[in-house]
C-alpha cells in the first residue's frame, strides 16, 4: 500500500501491461488540494469516470477514480462515521454517472446536509435507471 507514484487522474487509460484485456480497476485515492485542485474549499471528495463506446454504440463507463481529501476526510470520519460513509456513497454515485440534484433530501445534493447519509428515493431511482443501460461486453 502507500501513496501512488504517479499522478492520479479521473480519466484513466487502459493499462494492458498491468491488467491484460481488462480496464484498470476503479481507484480510490487520498489527495490534497495541491495534488487535486478540485478538492478546494469545503470539497471533501471528487469522482470521475471514463466512458467509451465502440463506434456509434452506446457510451459505457469502464473505469474511474474517487478522490477523498486527505486533510479533511479523516476528521469527518472520526467525528461522524455516517457522514463520511455518505460522502463515499455520494462520490461512488458520481463514478457511475449520477449528477448533483437540487433536492436537499437526496444524497446527491452538492452540499452535505445534516442527517442525509444514505441514498434517498431519488438517488435510488437514478441509480436504477443507470443500471438499466446497455452492457457492452466487447469493451
Label each residue range with its predicted role:
Residues 49-83, 99-139:
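Metalloprotease/metallohydrolase-associated module, dominated by Zn2+-dependent proteases
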Residues 1-87:
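Metzincin-family zinc-dependent endopeptidase catalytic domain
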Residues 86-98:
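Active-site recognition of the HExxH zinc-binding catalytic motif
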Amino acid at each position: 500500500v502507500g501513496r501512488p507514484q504517479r499522478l492520479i487522474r479521473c480519466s484513466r487509460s487502459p493499462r494492458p501491461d498491468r491488467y491484460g484485456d481488462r480496464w484498470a480497476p476503479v481507484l480510490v485515492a487520498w489527495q490534497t488540494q495541491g495534488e487535486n485542485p478540485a478538492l478546494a474549499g469545503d470539497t471533501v471528495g471528487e469522482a470521475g469516470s471514463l466512458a467509451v463506446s465502440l463506434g456509434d454504440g452506446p457510451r459505457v463507463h469502464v473505469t474511474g477514480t474517487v478522490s477523498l481529501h486527505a486533510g479533511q476526510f479523516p476528521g469527518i470520519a472520526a467525528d461522524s462515521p455516517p457522514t463520511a460513509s455518505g460522502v463515499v456513497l455520494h462520490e461512488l454515485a458520481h463514478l457511475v454517472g449520477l449528477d448533483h440534484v437540487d433536492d436537499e433530501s437526496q444524497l446527491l445534493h452538492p452540499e452535505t446536509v445534516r442527517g442525509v447519509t444514505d441514498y434517498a428515493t431519488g438517488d435510488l431511482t437514478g441509480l436504477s435507471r443507470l443500471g438499466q443501460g446497455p452492457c457492452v461486453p466487447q469493451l
